[in-house]
């Protein structure tokens, strides 16, 4: 009987998909209110303490 070869060999490295972005790596407060607001719109929410530091800039 002939042995069938497996379709995927175990020696193949697994593909790791990682998002490389500053917002995911950086845990420091944002230094720019515009960056904070854009990230908030994109769903990369941070705590509102970042926004409270820039409250005096808002009309």
Curated annotation (Swiss-Prot):
It comes from the Eukaryota. Residues 1-22 are annotated as: Disordered. This is Embryonic testis differentiation protein homolog C. It comes from Homo sapiens. The lineage of its organism: Eukaryota, Metazoa, Chordata, Craniata, Vertebrata.
